[in-house]
Amino acid sequence: MSRRENKSSVVKKDLSVKKESGAEKKSLAQSLRDWVSSLMLGKPHAVMAAVSVAVLLAAFLIFNNLTVSYARRWDIDWGYYSILSTFVLLIAGIIVNIPFVAKHLKGFLPSGKSFCGLALLLIFFSVFMFGNISNTHRVLSDETSWESMGLQMYFQHTGGICNEGVWTDGVLDCKTEVNNFKGKALGFVYSLVFNFMEPDRDTALLVNYPFYILSLIAFFLALSKWFGSSKLALAATAFLGGMPIYLLQARSASTEVLYICLLTFLMAWYAFVPTNKVTWKHFLLTVPLLGFFAQTRQETVFAFVPFALYYYRYFLEKPYRLPAFIASVIAVSWPSVNNMAAYRGYDFQGGEHAAHSFDNLWFNLKTNIVTMLNFDTDPSFGGIMTNPFYTTFTIILLVATVWLLVRMIVFGRYVRGFILGIFFCLQIFVIMFNVSGTFTIDINQRYVLVALPMFALLMALGLYDALEFSTKMRKYAAASIVMGLACVLTLGLMLYHAPSYRNNMLYYKNKLLGEEEFLNNELASYPANSVFIYSRPWQMLAQGHSAFSERTFEGWSTDVFAEWMQKSGGNIYLVRGQDGYGKVNRESRVVGFKTTDQIDKILDSYKHERVLVDAKKFGYPLVIYKIISKKGVSHYAQNFTVSEQMDGMIVLNKRFPESIACDYSLNDEKQGDILLTLEADTLRLDSLKIRNGMNRALFTCSMPDADTTIIYRDFFLESDRAVLLSALKMERYAQDWGDPQVNQSVEHHRLTLDGEPFRYGIGSHANSSLEYTLPRGFDMFHAVVGLDDESACGDGAYFVVLGDGRELARSKKLYSMEKQKLDVEITGVRHLNLKVEMGDNKDCDHGDWAHSWLEAR
């Protein structure tokens, strides 16, 4: 074959852009009318549309009727298992489609020469990234929350974030789990990776680079097929891979990199399966991919329309196909939908701006374009870029988009792509409706990542089409020129701005990143059993440190404080960072919080020693205090602990040489006196005095300084005749404020009534209704009820017990510092409903059902 013939065959094989003639010159309106006529819609399609709408309406009604409390509980209890089932379905989809892929793969792949070009591009990107971009967090609170979620999925198989916890021998014991309005996909990926590598932040930071490389390969394969030109696909891939924001995030732990990876996988899969060869087997892979895609960012569910439109002819063939597809996608995407219900009406900013509005849309649109066109540099950092956007790329994008719109409107070109693209952009509109969708908030400039693949596609296609149309040059030559221009621009700009990458452009202004890196190195030298009090405890957990929030630490009783002093060997540290100074700016669009008041209160309430201060590095003093003791409380009481009961024994520990005398009682019966002379002593309880159900040991100890310390130790002996209410599943609940808490108050503190702590029970809030289905055979319900001591301003509340809809007991009106014991007969009752009813108002009515349990006589 001659060289000319070979080149001609390459042109025919490599390009699929039609000549400008005939149908191409139809008006846009005429093209749409012809398309609708070609569908030959009839009664079956009307049925299909009706059923599809019904499925969507049913899903919306379920979503709209989910209570916030129920949605949040479901998120924690079932979030992990939901995405795990989607992962299993994904594996099944891959296995089922292996024969189809093996049969058609060779015809799908572009030429070996084009793969060599892609390989060179990937090598350049990789060398540049590892040489110029540090591997670190860039959006600290979000990235560490996914890491903490991954830890919780790995250790506990639940769907929330471990907000507070303790590391013991490499295992995280989560003390407080909270919801996360972010998606679960990245956390789940971490939970898988933690099976093979250390479960910590350093492992998490290694995950995104492979996603980055895989996304560029998938993007190239998809566009090679759709463009019919591997050169044009390589141009778009160069634009995508060289975007500064993408390069930076690929060396972080951001979910947007996984988002792009999954999107490009979907693009490649859709390009691989022609519309005339699609079967149900292909959707067995498509649906779980969409499920994972939806759980990268919750707004992604608004981008699903084009994934159905692409195969519209397949769906039109059978009336059940589209409704089945919609129902399946809703099922695998439900965790994201549930998150929207869980945070419905949640005011993230707490300021003067509406969470979602058209004002936000216009403000964000204007400010984002201005930011992406920003030429400003920072002379104090050697003239580096202040924003991770190339102005050149933004100009190309704007011009290319306008050109393609003109081509569509005037010449009727790219209509199908426009329709698919505009539906895909629904998620972008949702983001920009949000108050924090503006790039004036530096860390939110990463939101542009959801649109980067589309931007790269438009840039390459717009340049190619404008060049080919205006010069009438051969399409192969036009594609080659665009490829060369894209590669030269991308690689040249990367090299020119290498100092900006090395100085972590944009993110160098985020003081919290420097604070995190400093603490990660500094705290590594502290004792392994140290406990840190910090505004972002989940971040500490991801670094492998035990941590609690300032608010939780404030709520520690002397007994609890002594317990943690014992466990930590006296190594409790308060870390005061950026969050510990100033007040929240209510006029700002930035999501923020401050713990200044809590820290000041802790420093006033505890004796402490300042062990580290750095006042220069961050623009504010970063201080670490070692907590010594509580002020105004016996030093001996803070160094005396009593263990929980285990096998009929309780261990008493003291961290001082003097002897102390204690008397103790068991279930309100005095048992005797103890003289403690050793550092630790073991007390064996009288087994005859221990009863089925609830037990309480009470220790009253005289300290060397004449102070008296009282410590309660509750334990429950479960049997077929005694069961804790908190061990039963709560079938449903409604609560006017907060969520019911198991063995904690509604604000996550120890249940405390009239100064008396309780180990077991349910913390609630008026007005509330907690419903249980009871096992058969139980005759009595026991509880101690009242308003928790954490709520001192309530005007009283009633505690009501209902059985099978009938009122069985009602407490008197209980005020703060009051409690009442309830012993209610429930023989034959199947449905138990516990209500807390407010007095004149519900403010501060934190109602506790302490020591609630069932007994069979």
Put a short name on every predicted segment.
Residues 50-60, 119-122, 234-235, 240, ...:
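Transmembrane alpha-helix segments characteristic
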Residues 78-86, 147, 250, 256, ...:
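Hydrophobic/aromatic-rich transmembrane helices and adjacent perimembrane loops
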Residues 89, 631-661, 667-671, 677-682, ...:
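Gly-Asp-aromatic-enriched flexible segments
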Residues 111-114, 225-226, 231, 276-281, ...:
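Membrane-interface helix-loop-helix junctions at transmembrane boundaries of multi-pass membrane enzymes
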Residues 115-123, 288, 326-330, 457, ...:
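Signature aromatic-anchored transmembrane alpha helix within multi-pass, membrane-resident enzymes
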Residues 141, 206-211, 235-265, 270, ...:
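Multi-pass, polyprenyl lipid-linked donor-dependent membrane glycosyltransferases
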Residues 310-400:
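Membrane-lumen/periplasm interface segments of specific transmembrane helices
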Residues 483-540, 553, 623, 652:
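Membrane-embedded, lumen/periplasm-facing catalytic core of multi-pass transferases
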